Regions:
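Cys/His-rich zinc-coordinating "finger/knuckle" motifs
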Residues: 26
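Bacterial signal peptide processing site
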Residues: 20-23
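C-terminal motif of bacterial Sec signal peptides marking the signal peptidase cleavage site
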Residues: 14-18
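First exposed extracellular module after export/assembly in secreted or surface-exposed proteins
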Residues: 29-233
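Positively charged n-region of N-terminal signal peptides that target proteins for export
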Residues: 1-4
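Sec-dependent N-terminal signal peptides
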Residues: 6-10
Length: 233
C-alpha cells in the first residue's frame, strides 16, 4: 500500500505561485489527479495517465529532476503544455508532482478482517470526489499527526448489509485505520483506491453507494456516478 504525501495540495499550489511570481515561470493549467506509469525500471522515465485514458508525457522534467516514479502510484501534477509529441495525447513541462495515498479495494467476508481494517471516522467533501472505471478518489479530512501511520481500504462488505442501497449501484464502504497515530488537528487529503480487485462487481453498474463513518454526522451514504474527469480542486 502506497502512502500519501504529507503536503496539502492547496499549500503546494500557493508555494509554486509564490516562488515563480517574479520570473513568470509557473504552471498555468489546472492541476490533475493522474496515475503514474513508468517506462523504465529506474523510474526516471515515466508518463501520466488521466482517468479518461488520456496520456501526458513530461519531456521537460528539469524542475522535478530528483523525482523517481512508481508504477500505478496516484499523483497530482502541475504542468504547462508544450508542442505535441508522438505517442502521447499531450507533451508537458512538469512543475511539481504530489503523490497521494494509493490504496486498494477488496471483498471482506469475515468479522476479523473488518476489525483489522479499522473503523475510524473521516470527513468527506463529495464535490471533490471522483469515480472512474479504474479508480475511486475521495477528499477526506481526519485528525492526524503522523500521516504515514494511516491506512485506508475500500471494501465490499459481505459481513454486514448496508442500511441504504440503490439499484444499479455497487455498495462499498470506506475503512480507516489510524494505526498508532495520536489525534491531531484535522487535515484534508486526497485518497485514491484501485478498483481492479472488485472490477467484476462493478460491471454494468452506474456507480457506487459509498458508506462512510463521518466525524460529525455519523454514518452517511453517498451515491457517486462514474465520471472520467480528474481535475484536482
Amino acid at each position: 500500500m502506497k502512502k500519501l504525501g504529507l503536503f496539502l495540495i492547496p499549500a503546494l499550489a500557493v508555494l509554486l505561485s509564490a516562488c515563480n511570481d517574479d520570473d513568470g515561470d509557473y504552471p498555468r493549467y489546472t492541476p490533475l489527479i493522474t496515475t503514474v506509469r513508468t517506462i523504465d525500471a529506474s523510474g526516471s522515465d515515466y508518463y501520466f495517465q488521466r482517468d479518461n485514458g488520456q496520456t501526458l508525457y513530461p519531456s521537460d522534467k528539469s524542475r522535478v529532476a530528483a523525482y523517481r516514479a512508481t508504477d500505478r502510484q496516484r499523483a497530482v501534477i502541475w504542468f504547462n503544455l508544450l508542442q505535441g509529441i508522438q505517442g502521447y495525447d499531450y507533451n508537458i513541462a512538469l512543475y511539481a508532482v504530489q503523490e497521494i495515498y494509493t490504496g486498494t479495494s477488496e471483498e471482506v467476508d469475515t468479522p476479523a478482517r473488518l476489525e483489522e481494517l479499522g473503523d475510524s471516522p473521516a470527513s468527506i467533501t463529495p464535490a471533490y470526489c471522483n469515480l472512474s472505471d479504474e479508480w475511486l478518489t475521495l477528499y477526506l479530512g481526519y485528525p492526524v499527526m503522523d500521516n504515514s501511520k494511516h491506512d485506508f481500504t475500500l471494501i465490499v462488505n459481505r459481513v454486514e448489509a448496508p442500511e441504504e442501497s440503490h439499484e444499479g449501484y455497487l455498495d462499498v464502504e470506506l475503512r480507516h485505520n489510524p494505526g498508532s497515530d495520536l489525534a491531531g488537528y484535522t487535515q484534508w487529503y486526497y485518497v485514491s483506491f484501485d478498483l481492479t480487485p472488485i472490477a467484476p462487481l462493478l460491471e454494468g453498474k452506474q456507480g457506487v453507494t459509498l458508506k462512510i463513518k463521518t466525524q460529525q454526522n455519523g454514518t452517511k451514504y453517498l451515491r457517486l456516478e462514474r465520471n472520467p474527469g480528474s481535475a484536482a480542486q
